[in-house]
Amino acid sequence: MDLETGEVSADSLQEGEGFVEDNLPTNGNSDTTENNIIDPFGDIFKPTQWVGNTPVRWSTCGTHPTEHPCNFVLLDQNGEEFQLYDHYDKAIVVDFSAGWCGPCRRAADVVQEHSDTFAGDGLLYVTVLIETATGEDPTVADLQAWADDHNITSAPVLAGSRALLESGGGDWALTGWPTFYFIKKEMDMHITMRGWSEEMLVELIEEILE
């Protein structure tokens, strides 16, 4: 990896200068019955989108470029359900963060700024908080505190858990914090960025808006 640019040639991964390796044990609270995740291994995770009144299902989903991301339904900081596939026609940044991760907190400080800057172009910036600062699954109150601490006023902050991640039996690959997925408006994966680089974030947002 080139530490100056953060570029990695393997499997279209971009890597920022600052990240935290995900080598911590799970906290033991990421049970698949956790209320933060609604039916995590049922139909809600099957790839579904609507064209008019017609449901469309993809036979596979994944995290590699050109694949369709796997759907999720999670609670946001207002206690309302957020479903990824409801936003089929938007370019989406999905930011997987943890409360104990320093680079994640630095990234969170500019979420609302970039969300506002690119909102008119059709960008949706989504934070999925996997763990709190103490390693617990986040509650709605934790999401509200995260949003308040980082001046996030409208961008969704969602309650995740390790059940979402491949290491916990889920579909989303994560080996370091934060990890960002960049998704095009057609709900196609574009690229992944591990670690924090604001310059690279903006460049990749512009790419998915092209």
For the regions a language model picked out, list residue spans one by one.
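Extracellular/periplasmic catalytic domains that process cell-envelope and extracellular macromolecules
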Residues: T63-E67, Y85-Y88, T117-G120, D149-I152, ...
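Thiol-/selenol-based redox modules, centered on thioredoxin-like
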Residues: T175-E210
